[in-house]
Amino acid sequence: MLTFLKTLFQPKQTNAALAWAAIQNKAGNKATSGYWLYAAPVHLVLQRDSFSLGAPAPLTLEADEIQALTNALNLHFNQDTGENNVQFFWHENVLFLRLDTNPNITTNAPQAALNKDINAFLPKGEGAIKWAKFTNEVQMLLFEHPVNLAREANKQATINSAWCYGLGKIE
């Protein structure tokens, strides 16, 4: 009975990231097997004792910003191994993340957390602690990235995190 009630009240997971990956895979493009998520570039706002997710989410980026951030993230997460265990892809104004291994998390779309304390909306599950470390690493890389320094100088919201959601697997 509890399982049935959870299905009624828990937010549905969006699998559009998986759908995009499947289409790309069939077309012979970038999508490869693995675990796929959206990775929405967002701006977290420091509140008195928490962070909230600032609107809009995802942030709108220029092509040069997208390219620079995607390159920096991919270089950082794959520099030690030379493998592509973690890959960020930008396609039609949407950022995707592909992982080799299941992160074992459940996620929420950023729209659910807009202008709210994000703690209730952060990924949950067996892999949540490891995921928090990964997210923190992304945030540290973004903090002083030249794209964000330029955005800050232009009085634009900085991209200080990636909100990942919509987990799905491609075989």
PLM regions: where:
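An N-terminal, globular interaction/scaffold subdomain
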Residues: M1-I66
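Soluble secreted/lumenal catalytic domains
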Residues: G28, S33-G34, S50, A63-L69, ...
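Broad, structure-driven detector of short, well-ordered beta-strand segments within folded domains
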Residues: V42-L46, A162, E171
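Glycine-rich, often proline-containing surface loops adjacent to acidic residues and nearby aromatics
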Residues: L44-A57, V94-L95, A113-F121
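Secondary-structure transition/turn motif
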Residues: P56, R98-P103
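Extended, Lys/Arg-enriched charged tracts that mediate electrostatic binding to polyanionic substrates
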Residues: P58-F88, H145-S161
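Short, glycine/charge-rich beta-strand/loop segments that flank catalytic centers
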Residues: N85-R98
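Loop-centered beta-sheet repeat module
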Residues: T101-I170
